[in-house]
Every structure is written in C-alpha cells, then in structure tokens.
C-alpha cells in the first residue's frame, strides 16, 4: 500500500518532468523563432547597408559620378553624370598601343575634372599620354603625375606676321621660334638619333597618301632601321592601316620615308615620322610631315619628337608647345628623362606660379 505522501511526491515528480520537457521544447521553439528572427534582421540589415553603401559611394566617394564611355575610330570619350545630369566630359585620341593625346576636358567642378582625367588614364594604361594644358592647369596635371614636355610641337603651317607671332607667344601656350632650353646645350650620350646628310644625288622621290599600296613589311623594316630595335610587324600594320592619315615616300619601289596621324576631325596626333638613314638630310622628313599635315586642314595638329629631332621642327611651320605635358607609360632613366621632360614644378619667369627648378 502506497502512502499518500509518496503518491503526492510521485505526482509532483511527474509534474516536474512534464514542466522540464515543456520548458525544453519551448526553448527549442524559441531558438527556432530567434534564429528566424535573426535571419530576417540580417536580411533587412543587408538591404539597408547595401543601399546605404551605394548611396554613400555615390554621394561621398564618387560625388554621384557615373562614367559612360564612347569610342569612334581613334577617338575615346568619357562622360560623367550625376543623377542623369551631365557634369563633365573628356576626349582623347589613341592608337590603341603606344600613344595617346588628351584633347579636351570639361567639368563643372575641379574634383570632377580630376576624376575624369584619372578615369581616362586608366583607359589609356600602358600608353604614352600627352596633353596641352592652359597655364592655370599645370598644377592639376603635375599632381596627377604628368611632367612638362620639352619636345612637343603644334603645326601652324604658314608664315605669320610679326603681330601674329607676338600674339601667339603672348598666349602663354607657345615658345618663340628657335627657343632652346638651357639643358639642351648640355651634351647628351648619343642615345638620341640625329641623322647625317646623305650623299645620294640621283634618285626620284614619289609621295603617296594611300594605304592600299603600302607594304607593311617594308614599313616595319624602315621603322627598325630609323629608330633601332625590333618592332612587332602586326602592331605596325594595325596602327598604320587604322590611322586616318598616312604619308609615304618612295624611291622607285623602295620605301624611304613614312608618317601617320590619328585624328577625330578637330584634333590630330602625328606619329612614326621616319626617314631611311641613307636618305636623311635631303628634306624628305620635312616634305613628308608637311604633306601629311596639309591633309588635316584646319585641325589642331600635335606631335612629339626625341631630343635629336628638336632642331628639325623648331622652325617656321611649327611652334614649340610651352604647356604640353607627358605621362610616361614607364619610368624613364634620369638621362633620358632629362631629354624629354622638364624638372617637376618647373615654371617660366612669366608664369604666375613660383619658379621651381628642382626635381
């Protein structure tokens, strides 16, 4: 016979077990609810943070800038938009391999302008990039990494009056005819080719601006002979065939000179001006460049040369650029840099900023 006290204890024990089991299952249920609630909160958090991050990137980091790119032939354009409103644009010419020229930059804010230039530099990575800036933009480009170019020229193509010459010089964009930097009087180590006058007397030159008769194997061989080193024949063919303007010089069927230019109809960049060393000193180079430039009537024509070619262009027909800048594709050795670039921070005495001639 079970005592009443024992019965009571057994009932209490069963009740306690039931309560423990109920609490255990309640905890399992609560755990699932909390887990689902946390998952839901994490999902909401991700949505909020992702949208906030997009908003933050636009409003704080990128100032709402969206870039849109357009390409046509040798021309590359990048437009910046903020809330579908155009805030800036930059245009450049590029041959797709080695050379590029930034032509125009417009932006509603200085920061947007800088970002546009950097965006274009990314598109032109691996190429030598030139730009002709106004004097007030020199600091901007030097901050980005450009160096003032010593060997850049703009084609004028006609004899100017004294008043026109003065106006051109006073614009602050060009140097006087025949201007030489003080460092150009220093002897170089012979790494820049300067052609010797040929002793050829009997030859007949034929000029052509047609690509259909061009033998690109001859073009590649001529560039190697004129500038040294080995060149990729495929790249030579691709760049010359896609250039908007070309000029060739032949002695009978032998190619003895060439040049090409990329253009968007308003701006042009002359490239690969070469004359067979056996024919140098006979004005072939000048005739090739002049004939090529005359094809691009009323265009702003830019070219850059090596230090040995400065004297060739530093005369009537061309004007030496005062505010041209270069962003090299690769770091230059100091001796070569001295021939192509001015020291960082260099300013002429008539420029508003303080003259600094230390690198």
Report each predicted region and the residues it spans.
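Conserved acetyl-CoA-binding loop of GNAT-fold acetyltransferases
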Residues: 143-151, 316-323
């Amino acid at each position: 016979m079970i005592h009443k006290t024992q019965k009571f204890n057994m009932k209490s024990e069963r009740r306690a077990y039931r309560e423990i089991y109920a609490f255990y299952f309640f905890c399992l249920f609560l755990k699932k609810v909390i887990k689902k609630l946390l998952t839901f909160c994490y999902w909401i958090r991700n949505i909020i943070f992702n949208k906030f991050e997009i908003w933050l990137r636009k409003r704080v980091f990128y100032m709402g800038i969206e870039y849109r790119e357009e390409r046509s032939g040798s021309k590359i354009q990048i437009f910046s938009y903020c809330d579908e409103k155009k805030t800036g644009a930059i245009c450049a010419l590029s041959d797709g391999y080695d050379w590029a020229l930034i032509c125009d930059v417009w932006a509603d804010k200085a920061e947007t302008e800088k970002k546009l230039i950097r965006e274009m530099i990314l598109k032109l990575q691996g190429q030598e990039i030139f730009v002709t800036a106004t004097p007030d933009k020199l600091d901007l480009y030097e901050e980005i990494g450009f160096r003032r170019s010593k060997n850049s020229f703009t084609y004028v193509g006609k004899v100017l009056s004294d008043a026109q010459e003065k106006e051109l010089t006073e614009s602050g964009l060009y140097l006087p005819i025949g201007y030489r930097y003080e460092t150009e009087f220093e002897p170089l180590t012979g790494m820049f080719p300067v052609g010797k006058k040929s002793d050829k007397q009997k030859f007949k030159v034929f000029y052509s601006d047609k690509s259909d008769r061009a033998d690109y194997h001859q073009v590649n061989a001529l560039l190697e002979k004129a500038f040294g080193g080995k060149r990729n024949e495929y790249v030579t063919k691709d760049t010359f065939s896609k250039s908007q303007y070309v000029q060739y010089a032949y002695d009978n069927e032998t190619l003895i000179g060439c040049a090409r230019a990329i253009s968007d109809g308003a701006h042009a960049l002359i490239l690969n001006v070469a004359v067979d060393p056996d024919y140098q000193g006979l004005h072939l180079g000048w005739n090739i460049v002049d004939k090529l430039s005359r094809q691009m009537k009323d265009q702003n024509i830019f070219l850059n040369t090596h230090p040995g070619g400065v004297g060739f262009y530093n005369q009537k027909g061309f004007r030496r650029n005062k505010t041209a800048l270069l962003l090299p594709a690769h770091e230059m050795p100091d001796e070569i840099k001295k021939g192509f670039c001015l020291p960082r921070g260099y300013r002429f005495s008539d420029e508003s900023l303080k003259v600094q001639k230390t690198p």
